[in-house]
Protein backbone atom coordinates (compact mmCIF):
# COMPACT_ATOMS: atom_id res chain seq x y z
CA UNK A 1 0.00 0.00 0.00
CA UNK A 2 2.83 2.45 0.75
CA UNK A 3 3.98 2.27 -2.87
CA UNK A 4 1.22 4.64 -3.86
CA UNK A 5 1.62 7.03 -0.96
CA UNK A 6 5.36 7.20 -0.26
CA UNK A 7 6.61 10.71 -0.98
CA UNK A 8 9.85 10.85 1.00
CA UNK A 9 12.59 8.47 2.06
CA UNK A 10 14.77 9.82 4.86
CA UNK A 11 18.14 8.25 5.77
CA UNK A 12 20.91 8.72 8.30
CA UNK A 13 24.48 8.77 7.02
CA UNK A 14 26.66 7.01 9.60
CA UNK A 15 25.70 3.36 9.98
CA UNK A 16 22.94 3.58 7.36
CA UNK A 17 23.91 5.00 3.96
CA UNK A 18 27.63 4.90 4.71
CA UNK A 19 29.47 1.62 4.57
CA UNK A 20 32.18 0.81 7.12
CA UNK A 21 34.75 2.49 4.86
CA UNK A 22 32.66 5.71 4.90
CA UNK A 23 31.58 5.38 1.26
CA UNK A 24 28.15 5.02 -0.33
CA UNK A 25 27.80 1.89 -2.44
CA UNK A 26 27.00 2.09 -6.13
CA UNK A 27 23.99 -0.12 -5.47
CA UNK A 28 22.61 2.30 -2.89
CA UNK A 29 23.09 5.24 -5.26
CA UNK A 30 21.36 3.29 -8.04
CA UNK A 31 18.35 2.43 -5.84
CA UNK A 32 18.04 6.04 -4.69
CA UNK A 33 18.11 7.16 -8.33
CA UNK A 34 15.30 4.71 -9.12
CA UNK A 35 13.26 6.11 -6.23
CA UNK A 36 13.75 9.64 -7.55
CA UNK A 37 12.60 8.53 -10.99
CA UNK A 38 9.37 7.36 -9.32
CA UNK A 39 8.87 10.83 -7.84
CA UNK A 40 10.02 10.00 -4.32
CA UNK A 41 12.00 12.70 -2.53
CA UNK A 42 15.28 11.64 -0.92
CA UNK A 43 16.34 13.14 2.39
CA UNK A 44 19.26 12.89 4.78
CA UNK A 45 18.87 13.28 8.54
CA UNK A 46 22.14 13.34 10.46
CA UNK A 47 23.69 14.58 13.66
CA UNK A 48 26.63 15.75 11.52
CA UNK A 49 26.74 19.37 10.44
CA UNK A 50 26.02 20.20 6.83
CA UNK A 51 29.68 21.19 6.41
CA UNK A 52 30.87 17.81 7.71
CA UNK A 53 28.51 16.01 5.35
CA UNK A 54 29.34 17.83 2.12
CA UNK A 55 31.32 14.99 0.54
CA UNK A 56 28.22 12.78 0.85
CA UNK A 57 25.64 15.47 0.13
CA UNK A 58 27.41 16.31 -3.13
CA UNK A 59 27.11 12.65 -4.10
CA UNK A 60 23.53 12.11 -2.87
CA UNK A 61 22.04 15.50 -3.80
CA UNK A 62 19.21 15.12 -1.26
CA UNK A 63 15.99 17.04 -1.69
CA UNK A 64 15.77 17.53 2.06
CA UNK A 65 18.57 17.81 4.63
CA UNK A 66 18.12 17.66 8.38
CA UNK A 67 21.52 18.29 9.95
CA UNK A 68 23.12 19.12 13.27
CA UNK A 69 20.73 16.79 15.06
CA UNK A 70 17.66 18.62 13.74
CA UNK A 71 18.85 22.16 14.41
CA UNK A 72 18.98 22.91 10.67
CA UNK A 73 16.49 21.86 8.00
CA UNK A 74 17.03 22.58 4.34
CA UNK A 75 14.68 21.96 1.41
CA UNK A 76 16.61 22.20 -1.82
CA UNK A 77 18.87 25.21 -1.31
CA UNK A 78 16.58 27.00 1.16
CA UNK A 79 16.89 26.79 4.93
CA UNK A 80 13.35 26.27 6.21
CA UNK A 81 14.19 25.81 9.90
CA UNK A 82 17.12 26.94 12.01
CA UNK A 83 17.43 26.66 15.79
CA UNK A 84 20.53 28.57 16.86
CA UNK A 85 22.02 29.52 20.18
CA UNK A 86 22.95 33.20 20.31
CA UNK A 87 26.59 34.27 20.58
CA UNK A 88 25.98 35.03 24.28
CA UNK A 89 24.41 31.60 24.89
CA UNK A 90 27.19 29.87 22.95
CA UNK A 91 29.93 31.56 24.96
CA UNK A 92 28.10 30.85 28.23
CA UNK A 93 28.04 27.14 27.29
CA UNK A 94 31.75 27.21 26.40
CA UNK A 95 32.53 28.85 29.76
CA UNK A 96 30.36 26.36 31.67
CA UNK A 97 31.94 23.42 29.83
CA UNK A 98 35.36 24.59 30.95
CA UNK A 99 34.19 25.07 34.55
CA UNK A 100 32.59 21.62 34.72
CA UNK A 101 34.99 19.62 32.54
CA UNK A 102 38.22 21.57 32.83
CA UNK A 103 39.96 24.04 30.57
CA UNK A 104 41.35 21.29 28.36
CA UNK A 105 37.99 19.74 27.45
CA UNK A 106 37.56 19.07 23.75
CA UNK A 107 34.74 21.05 22.15
CA UNK A 108 33.13 21.02 18.73
CA UNK A 109 30.66 23.64 17.57
CA UNK A 110 28.55 23.57 14.44
CA UNK A 111 27.35 26.78 12.85
CA UNK A 112 25.40 27.18 9.64
CA UNK A 113 28.63 27.66 7.70
CA UNK A 114 31.36 25.77 9.56
CA UNK A 115 32.45 23.11 12.02
CA UNK A 116 34.86 24.32 14.75
CA UNK A 117 36.98 22.23 17.09
CA UNK A 118 39.78 22.46 19.62
CA UNK A 119 40.82 18.80 19.67
CA UNK A 120 44.38 17.97 20.53
CA UNK A 121 44.43 15.58 17.56
CA UNK A 122 43.14 16.81 14.21
CA UNK A 123 39.88 14.85 13.69
CA UNK A 124 40.56 14.72 9.95
CA UNK A 125 43.60 12.55 10.69
CA UNK A 126 41.31 10.06 12.43
CA UNK A 127 38.42 10.21 9.94
CA UNK A 128 38.78 11.86 6.53
CA UNK A 129 34.99 12.02 6.14
CA UNK A 130 34.76 14.97 8.54
CA UNK A 131 35.54 17.47 5.82
CA UNK A 132 36.84 20.95 6.44
CA UNK A 133 36.92 21.85 10.11
CA UNK A 134 38.31 25.03 11.62
CA UNK A 135 40.62 24.86 14.62
CA UNK A 136 40.05 27.43 17.37
CA UNK A 137 40.64 27.72 21.10
CA UNK A 138 37.15 29.34 21.40
CA UNK A 139 38.61 32.25 23.41
CA UNK A 140 36.96 34.85 21.19
CA UNK A 141 34.20 32.88 19.50
CA UNK A 142 31.66 35.25 17.93
CA UNK A 143 29.16 33.07 16.10
CA UNK A 144 25.74 31.67 16.81
CA UNK A 145 25.84 27.90 17.15
CA UNK A 146 23.58 25.06 16.11
CA UNK A 147 25.26 22.49 18.35
CA UNK A 148 27.99 22.40 20.97
CA UNK A 149 29.52 19.03 21.82
CA UNK A 150 32.00 18.05 24.51
CA UNK A 151 34.37 15.11 24.54
CA UNK A 152 35.29 14.64 28.17
CA UNK A 153 36.91 11.24 27.60
CA UNK A 154 38.79 9.20 30.19
What are these model-predicted stretches?
Residues 2-21, 93:
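Asp-based phosphoryl-transfer active-site loop
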Residues 2-5, 22-26, 65-68, 138-142:
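Short hydrophobic/aromatic-rich motifs at helix boundaries and adjacent loops
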Residues 23-127:
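Active-site phosphate-binding/coordination module
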Residues 77-80, 150-154:
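Short, solvent-exposed beta-strand edge segments and adjacent coil->beta transition regions
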Residues 123-148:
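Acidic, His- and aromatic-enriched active-site or binding-groove loops in soluble protein domains
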